[in-house]
Regions:
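Active-site loop/oxyanion-hole signature of alpha/beta-hydrolase fold enzymes
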Residues: 31-71, 227
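Catalytic histidine-centered segment of alpha/beta-hydrolase-like enzymes
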Residues: 213-226, 244-246
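Conserved HGGG/HGGXW glycine-rich cap/lid loop of the alpha/beta-hydrolase fold
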Residues: 2-42
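Flexible "cap/lid" loop of the alpha/beta hydrolase fold
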Residues: 84-125
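Conserved alpha/beta-hydrolase "acid-adjacent" motif
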Residues: 190-196
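Gly/Ala-rich beta-loop-alpha elbow adjacent to hydrolase catalytic centers
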Residues: 74-78, 82
Length: 255
């Protein structure tokens, strides 16, 4: 029985951000799928809500779990949603979780400042596309540079999605998680701000910091992220073999 991987993209982008990883996993013979969240990619015309985003993740996980243990992988907003999902009141069929570029609680002054900057950029004549293209050209290798934009940018969804993220009780969710968990951040990622808190909430989790990379490290250094995927797959396979796989804390054990 092979480990099944489900990818959840970040804000503004879509499932296409994972093209490099999907290609690599196909070569390795590891089944994988990448979802489009509401308001993004092929679902650009839909309204974004946390409820529908969670339903999307749950449907993909359930479908994958019919074929083997599931490794859930989320980046940025996708990572936050994945943490909330795995640490939620239900016990999803997830055997391991990679939470990339998301060790930050989306609330308070930090979230307000981020939304203000995003709104200011969105008011530019080209809605900030010139800036986005220059940043990608300066930081992302040519072979993965187009992956973030290939499914379109969800500019009309961004502010709504950010506001919705503030409703997540991430501190409670992260503390409940008992499956193998990896926090993976770029060295210069602005969302490392609450990294120490996340490590305290999930002391069993592994922290991997990718040197000389930013928030978009999955595309900056895809080979390193592929190595993290291999590590997670091997860990889940070993746990399945020895029968040591863990799950989220059941409700009766919550403090």
């Amino acid at each position: 029985v092979s480990v099944q991987i489900v990818f959840v993209h970040g804000i503004r982008t879509s499932a296409t951000m994972w093209r490099s990883q999907l290609e690599y996993l196909e070569e390795q013979g590891i089944p994988a799928t990448a979802v489009d969240l509401p308001g993004h990619g092929t679902r650009m015309s839909e309204d974004f809500t946390v409820h529908e985003a969670m339903h999307t993740i749950d449907a993909a996980v359930r479908a994958a779990a019919a074929h083997g243990p599931v490794l859930l992988v989320g980046h940025s907003m996708g990572g936050l949603l994945a943490l909330a999902y795995v640490g939620g009141a239900q016990r999803p069929q997830v055997a391991g979780l990679i939470a990339a570029s998301c060790t930050s609680l989306p609330r308070g002054a930090g979230l307000a400042a981020y939304r203000a900057i995003a709104r200011a950029v969105d008011r530019l004549p080209d809605r900030g596309m010139w800036i986005t293209k220059r940043i990608l050209e300066a930081t992302i290798p040519e072979e993965t540079r187009s992956d973030f934009a290939a499914g379109g940018y969800a500019l009309d969804t961004q502010d709504t999605a950010l506001g919705n993220l503030a409703t997540l009780d991430l501190a409670t969710a992260v503390a409940r998680i008992r499956v193998p968990l990896w926090f993976v951040n770029g060295q210069w990622d602005q969302l490392r701000v609450n990294e120490p808190l996340f490590r305290r909430l999930a002391p069993h989790a592994e922290l991997i910091v990718v040197p000389r990379t930013t928030h978009l490290f999955t595309a900056m250094r895809p080979q390193i992220f592929n190595a993290v995927l291999r590590l997670a797959v091997a860990t889940i396979e070993a746990a399945q073999t020895t029968g040591t796989a863990a799950g989220p804390i059941p409700p009766e054990e919550w403090e």
